[in-house]
Amino acid sequence: MISDSKLLASAAWDAQSLNELKAKASEDPAANIRPVARQVEGMFVQMMLKSMRDALPKDGLFSSEHTRLYTSMYDQQIAQQMTTGKGLGLAEMMVKQMTPEQPLPEESTPAAPMKFPLETVVRYQNQALSQLVQKAVPRNYDDSLPGDSKAFLAQLSLPAQLASQQSGVPHHLILAQAALESGWGQRQIRRENGEPSYNLFGVKASGNWKGPVTEITTTEYENGEAKKVKAKFRVYSSYLEALSDYVGLLTRNPRYAAVTTAASAEQGAQALQDAGYATDPHYARKLTNMIQQMKSISDKVSKTYSMNIDNLF
């Protein structure tokens, strides 16, 4: 069996590594399920990073063939680090689905093989990851989220995963709070000139904030009663800056310690309300409803397909 450390120490996406893994998997498929799953998870992460890079302008002042080469190598290193240890959870999910001793629950949807061979990944490596997934995943699950919501989750899902790994805040809680505070990105706080503030989490501009601010009318609760008040909120240059500031706010402030150590997203939601993040007395319940909705959709997607090691090679 090939160890994870050996795979990660090598050039994990070169042909030699894949051929070696293919040979080992053919000899003993059951013993090599985990390294195969790790390899596939790594390729998915690298493809996501590449899709993000492709969306950026390529004619900047510091853009050249050399910088693009170094960026590609850097992305490979990031992908390797992200899939080390627990990774993003994709590999573990595949291991559970491909291990006979751990069958899916009886009430799950009948499994349909996911037609996603390795040749497809290699042949269409320049194709957007979302297009590949759309072709591979069956369409017979009940998706109750509207289109704008799905686009919002797709944009923030990977950054939320990274922020969760760095801070300890459950990633479903990060997504749910961003969705609740911004109305799935459709009702986010605006600047005076109408431009977006990128303030996804409704963070107010307290006395120690030195950046730009915007003042809006918002709803606050006093003794359980809703009131309209004027309040100043922080303004960011991007969603990533907003996410970084949000994580820093929770990790640096001792009163949010229960949020960063919460065992589940639902417990984290209650910890946020207990710490006084929002004045809404129903804040935790609203977050929990969104968290459960997101988890339900994820479960329905995962139960509609299964992966077989023979179909990967």
Swiss-Prot record:
Enumerate the active-site residues: 220, 245
A single GO BP term for this record reads: cell wall organization
Query: Which principal EC class is assigned to this enzyme?
Result: hydrolase
Where does this protein reside within or beyond the cell? Periplasm
- Kindly give the Pfam families that the UniProt entry links to this protein: Glucosaminidase (PF01832), Rod-binding (PF10135)
Q: Which PANTHER family match?
A: PEPTIDOGLYCAN HYDROLASE FLGJ
Further facts: Probably exported via the flagellum-specific export pathway.
UniProt protein name = Peptidoglycan hydrolase FlgJ
Gene encoding it? flgJ
